[in-house]
Amino acid sequence: MYFCTSFLDKETRMKKTLLIIFVVVGMLAQVSKSCNRVPKESTPTPEVVAETTVDSVAVLCLADTSRNPIEILERLMSQPDCPMHGPTHHVLVGAALLTAYNNCLPDSAKLDMEAALAEVRERGEQVPGGACGYMGACGASISTGIFMSIVTRNTPFSTDTWRLCNHCTALALEQVAENGGPRCCKRDSYLSVLTAIDFVKENLGVEMVKPEVRCSRSQINEQCIGKKCPFAPKP
């Protein structure tokens, strides 16, 4: 009888202990959810901001009729959520070039822009932020090669177009390198687009509009090189 009573007491204590454990685990789970929940008034991370900018690229580019890729680039970079620097530009450069290029083509040669812009985004987002510093290759310049590879349907097994795509990227990188650091994603985007405009005219026979560029964002760039920048505002 004593054994049975003792056993039942132990069983009861065990049930109570398990019940307490379940209650505590449930409370901890609720606390964890509350901690991970982002309040509406919190500031979005740079990654979320950049994603918002890129999400609207296709919509803006599909509606744009300009043959001036710098003009298109400016519209894309002027979105409220577009950061001063960052991998967003690895998509914007190629998208601006693609849009202006397509607007220069006759109707019979138009690209499937929805598919092309989706491809620019997919490839551009594979180029990591900081590639200019950590890999020695500016993502904005690489974006010119992405643009070229799409319009020429280039693959790793191509011949002449393989040369063209790599050459375009190399020339853009050369311009970026000659102007030195520290990095400025706006400056490097301008340099890359202007280089691609000349390259496309010479090698593909398509003439996009090439304007004079003046920077309007030097005041918000903490690393601005000032008068050394080729796009510094005129006094």
Which residues are covered by each model-predicted region?
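Cys/His-rich short segments
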Residues: 1, 36-51, 217-220, 226, ...
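Short, Lys/Arg-enriched N-terminal segments with co-localized hydrophobic residues
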Residues: 2-13
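Bacterial Sec-dependent signal peptides at the C-terminal "C-region" and cleavage site
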Residues: 27-39
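Acidic-glycine-rich active-site phosphate/pyrophosphate-binding loop
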Residues: 60-75, 110-125, 166
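Polybasic, low-complexity association/targeting segments
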Residues: 61-97, 182, 215
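A short glycine/serine-rich beta->alpha loop
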Residues: 76-87, 126-136, 176-183
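Conserved mixed alpha/beta catalytic, RNA-binding, or beta-rich assembly cores of soluble enzyme
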Residues: 93-104, 114-158, 162, 166
